[in-house]
Amino acid sequence: MDASTKTKKGAGGRKGGGPRKKSVTRSIRAGLQFPVGRIGRYLKKGRYAQRVGTGAPVYLAAVLEYLAAEVLELAGNAARDNKKNRIIPRHVLLAVRNDEELGKLLAGVTIAHGGVLPNINPVLLPKKTERSNTVSKEPKSPKPKAGKSPKKA
């Protein structure tokens, strides 16, 4: 037997075969953008449980992707309301705090450089009177025009 006639099996038996088949990631299979494999690795490495099922990282990736999309959509709306093209932490804070469900979910979270929600205590606002509601028919007296002051010599 000649050693050169044997096929080497170091590459999984495909050494002389055709082109390699394109790999399909679990993220692509699930139709997700978030990395299913990386999340699965983190679940295993974090020792949250002895074993991690095959569906757990897919489900978690889908949930995280949904939450990220929701926050980014609301933050994009906040940026557009402020006539800006770029989302900054302030827009993220406004989006999260103005949304009831996200505000409840992220109640204990501090967003760096987010600031605070604008809020004025109603007691400090000027009181509405009856005169402001009804239009007064009396014209206001015009202000006297200020003439030129005489030049000082």
Swiss-Prot record:
Which residue intervals make up region (Disordered)?
1-24, 127-153
Positions in coiled-coil regions: none
A GO CC annotation recorded here is: nucleus
Q: Where is the composition biased (Basic residues)?
A: 142-153
| Superkingdom as given in the UniProt entry | Eukaryota
Q: Name the Gene Ontology molecular function terms of this record.
A: DNA binding; protein heterodimerization activity; structural constituent of chromatin
Span(s) of short sequence motif SPKK motif: 149-152
Question: Where do Basic and acidic residues bias regions lie?
Answer: 127-141
Q: Where in the cell is it found?
A: Nucleus; Chromosome
Pfam families with a match to the protein in the record: Histone, Histone_H2A_C
> Does Zinc appear among the keywords?
no
Keywords annotated in UniProt = Chromosome, DNA-binding, Nucleosome core, Nucleus
Q: How does it assemble?
A: The nucleosome is a histone octamer containing two molecules each of H2A, H2B, H3 and H4 assembled in one H3-H4 heterotetramer and two H2A-H2B heterodimers. The octamer wraps approximately 147 bp of DNA.
Q: What does this protein do?
A: Core component of nucleosome. Nucleosomes wrap and compact DNA into chromatin, limiting DNA accessibility to the cellular machineries which require DNA as a template. Histones thereby play a central role in transcription regulation, DNA repair, DNA replication and chromosomal stability. DNA accessibility is regulated via a complex set of post-translational modifications of histones, also called histone code, and nucleosome remodeling.
Record comment regarding domains: Contains one SPKK motif which may interact with the minor groove of A/T-rich DNA sites. Phosphorylation of this motif may regulate DNA binding. This motif is reiterated in both termini of histone H1 and in the N-terminus of sea urchin histones H2B, but its presence in the C-terminus seems to be unique to plant H2A.
Give the family from UniProt. Belongs to the histone H2A family.
The name this protein goes by in its record: Probable histone H2A.2
